[in-house]
């Protein structure tokens, strides 16, 4: 019988084992900020590494970029973020709590089991629903809300010593615009022909009204985005290609297919720049949630930046001489919620010799520690430690000499370490060690000088 995975179990494991800590904890914290501990940063880096390998390094089409977080304010005017990047905000007049009106309604609909979609609703329609159904405040139960108003999600700051409109800038709410404004630079210097893509990994910031569910939705987050430019008319073919590519990537690196689904956006849901959008959703303990968004952004962004900047964003086909503004397909995923999905999907409990064994069945490429080395006895520390130091040159490794071997295995199982190497008294004579597999718990004896080759083969992706 499959174990029931709860958010409480995942959060407890993450905090207790050094994956994720509350931000600014010694000062009482800062709501919905998280720091990644020794295991968390390794796991995040592994996720970014395998995304980069599959989407950029191994792709004959794609190249990378690392654009600035702070950009000219006009970038966000052109993209539409200054005018329309907002959520519907309302306050409870009784307890002063703030809510997103659409989420308030969606939670009410879910609770009541109603079959209603509010996608595309105006503020007026949402307010009418709240009044008609007497939707209560989730905090205090009152039905006394302010009118709904727009709340811009961008963090505003200033460059230089004066705080006026000329020095106003924003922390970027997405990495995509840094790619669009560099389209001509990248195309010219890389000499790429359409179709080609530009990818990047970086921090983004959104002043979310109601962040939550641990690291699923935070105000500071990391994105992995690809903007793939193609000829108009070939856009849906590439849209379907990247849609499937993203799903295959998730399954290849360990997510169970039954916990994933495609959700195509209805016409009324589509963003103003999109003609087609599909979300790959994951079945989290709190329900289905967006994991990866794949959007056909058409030529909207390049056209907007061409109009606002005066820079020519057209592409000339080197064979036919045809000029056009390329269409863009965007697969965009958040590293933090991807890490949460991998933790949830990998978490398992089983009974072994009357005890509960907690194990993270992470794909070896994602596991923060690849191998742990144990001496069977402290008398064997010196030889075992030398093996550990040699392996650490090639793999993230841990050394553990305290407690019984069984207890040491359990500690590594809980953090997802795929392999454990034990140096015992026989090792001194036969120059072999025991390697134990995390998932099967099977053990094999292998020559000490073959351990690194064995691990390289097993950890290859």
Curated annotation (Swiss-Prot):
One of its GO terms (biological process) is glycyl-tRNA aminoacylation. It holds the Pfam family HGTP_anticodon. The keyword DNA damage does not apply. Substrate binds at residues 100, 174, 221-225, 330-334. PANTHER family: DNA POLYMERASE SUBUNIT GAMMA-2, MITOCHONDRIAL, GLYCYL-TRNA SYNTHETASE/DNA POLYMERASE SUBUNIT GAMMA-2. Homodimer. This is Glycine--tRNA ligase. It comes from Caldanaerobacter subterraneus subsp. tengcongensis (strain DSM 15242 / JCM 11007 / NBRC 100824 / MB4).
